[in-house]
Amino acid sequence: MKKTLLILIILSLPLISKGSDNLVAVLYLKNGSYVSSDSVYTFLNLDGTLFDELRSRNGNEPTCLKIDRDNSVSYYPDLMIYVFFCKLSPTRKVLVRVGHDWKILKTNSPFTVLPTKRYLLSLDIQLRVGDILYDKRDKVKVKRCIIRHIIDARGDYVAVEIKKRKLWFRWKRHYQVIPDRLLYN
């Protein structure tokens, strides 16, 4: 009995571990035009019970009860795209991080799983007055709002180029993303 319990605990470790932020899931509710009024992304708790549904509604904002833009990596309302940190379970299910919790993503609607770094390198970032940028030696305080393309990403930091200097900005703290900074170009 103890041996069976130990095996079950070891097999479930990837699901109950802190997880990684090396992948993101990009959910498309609109692709040129709305995918359809029945475009549904279902989020299940790890025990299989329903957590929430993200639905496309023809001509309107997507509907969901418990998921808001602060629970995702990014939300692009003009394009109707949600982005979540994700990982694959040992049974090949896609798990997405909604806030601080992992949920099972179940859908027949289009979505893409990408390495987080590849996703970030396709974006611009908005830097605001008072933001702190770092290089090898200095801290630089942003004096006016600027938008720069992301040229590198490592962990919680992304790099931008300003006046031929590679400067780093902290875009997230662990799984908490600084909202409304990542811009889809």
Q: For each of these PLM feature ranges, what is it?
A:
Residues 184-185:
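Short, solvent-exposed mixed-charge patches
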Residues 70-106, 142-174:
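SH3/SH3-like beta-barrel superfamily modules
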Residues 20-86, 114-153:
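Beta-loop motif signature
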Residues 1-16:
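Sec-dependent N-terminal signal peptides
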Residues 94, 100-123:
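Mature extracytoplasmic/lumenal regions of exported proteins
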Residues 177-179:
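Residue patterns forming the tRNA-binding/recognition surfaces of aminoacyl-tRNA synthetases
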Residues 59, 107-111, 173-175:
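Surface-exposed flexible segments
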